[in-house]
Amino acid sequence: MCFPNIHKQGYPFIAIAFVLTCIGFAFSFGLGLVFQIITVLCACFFRNPDRIVPVDDKLIISPADGLVTSVAEVESPIEAGKMVTRVSVFLSILNVHVNRAPVSGSVKLVEHRPGRFSPACTDGSTSENERVRSVIESTFGNHNIVIEQVAGVLARRIVCDLKVGDNVKLGSRMGIIRFGSRVNVYVPAGVPVLVTEGHTLVGGETVIADLDSERTAGYPRATFEKV
C-alpha cells in the first residue's frame, strides 16, 4: 500500500476531497477549510492501524473495533438445529472499520446476501440487512467459525477480501465496512465466551473465546506480533 495507515478503499474518497479542497481554496479560504476538514475526516475513517495480535491458533479474537451489543445463544446460520453463541459487535462511525479474521484457518464459504439497510445496532439487522457471510474452518479443532459483516443505515458498501480456499492467520485483515456497521461472530457450542454485552472490543486484539476447553486459566501470555 502507498499509505500503510490508510485502507485502499479510502483512496478515492480522500483524493476527491483533496481536489475539492484545492478548488475551494481557489474561491475562498472558508470553502477550502470546509473541504480540508472533510479530507481529514475521510482519512480518519479509513485509518488502518496495525494491531498487536496474539500468536495462538486456539483463540477467537474480535474481528472489529466496537461495542458488544449482544451475546446470545442462537441457531447456527449454516447448520440447522445446531446451537451456537453469537457475539454481535456494533461499529460506530468513529471506530476503525477494517475487519480482521477472528481465527486462523481455511476459508470454506463466502456469500453475499442482499437486504435492507436498517440500523445495525438492532438484532433484527442480522437477518434483514445486506450482509456478507464467511466461514473459516479453524486450524485448531476444525470448527466452522462464521463471521457476518452486516450493513447499516450509513454502511452501504461491504468489502470482503476473503476467497474460498484462502488460508488466513489470526488477526489478518479481511475487509472493511464503510460508514457504520455490525459484525457477528458465531462461537461453537460448549466454548466459553469471554466477553459480555457492553464490553468495548479492539479488533485483532481482544480475545472473545478460547477453543481449547482444557485451558482453564485463560489464554497464555505468550507471544504477540504486529499485524
Curated annotation (Swiss-Prot):
Instruction: Specify the pathway.
Output: Phospholipid metabolism; phosphatidylethanolamine biosynthesis; phosphatidylethanolamine from CDP-diacylglycerol: step 2/2
**What biological process terms from GO does the record include?**
phosphatidylethanolamine biosynthetic process
Cite the active-site annotation: S181 (schiff-base intermediate with substrate)
Q: Explain how, and how many, cofactor molecules are bound.
A: Binds 1 pyruvoyl group covalently per subunit.
Task: Classify the main location.
Answer: membrane
Q: What is its EC number?
A: 4.1.1.65
- What cofactors does this protein use? pyruvate
What processing steps or modifications follow its translation?
Is synthesized initially as an inactive proenzyme. Formation of the active enzyme involves a self-maturation process in which the active site pyruvoyl group is generated from an internal serine residue via an autocatalytic post-translational modification. Two non-identical subunits are generated from the proenzyme in this reaction, and the pyruvate is formed at the N-terminus of the alpha chain, which is derived from the carboxyl end of the proenzyme.
Question: Catalysed reaction(s)?
Answer: a 1,2-diacyl-sn-glycero-3-phospho-L-serine + H(+) = a 1,2-diacyl-sn-glycero-3-phosphoethanolamine + CO2
Q: What are the residue positions of the site described as Cleavage (non-hydrolytic)?
A: G180, S181
Query: Which keywords label this protein?
Result: Cell membrane, Decarboxylase, Lipid biosynthesis, Lipid metabolism, Lyase, Membrane, Phospholipid biosynthesis, Phospholipid metabolism, Pyruvate, Zymogen
Task: From the record, give the cysteines joined by S-S bonds.
Answer: none
Specify the protein's topology with respect to the membrane: Peripheral membrane protein
**What GO molecular function terms would the record report?**
phosphatidylserine decarboxylase activity
InterPro entries listed in its UniProt record: PS_Dcarbxylase, PSD-A
Q: Where in the cell is it found?
A: Cell membrane
This protein's GO cellular component annotations are: plasma membrane
Highest taxon in the source lineage = Bacteria
* Its job: Catalyzes the formation of phosphatidylethanolamine (PtdEtn) from phosphatidylserine (PtdSer).
Concerning PANTHER family, the annotation shows: ARCHAETIDYLSERINE DECARBOXYLASE PROENZYME-RELATED (PTHR35809:SF1)
Subunit description: Heterodimer of a large membrane-associated beta subunit and a small pyruvoyl-containing alpha subunit.
Q: Which family does it belong to?
A: Belongs to the phosphatidylserine decarboxylase family. PSD-A subfamily.
Q: Which HAMAP family match?
A: PS_decarb_PSD_A
Protein name, please?
Phosphatidylserine decarboxylase proenzyme
- Gene behind this chain? psd
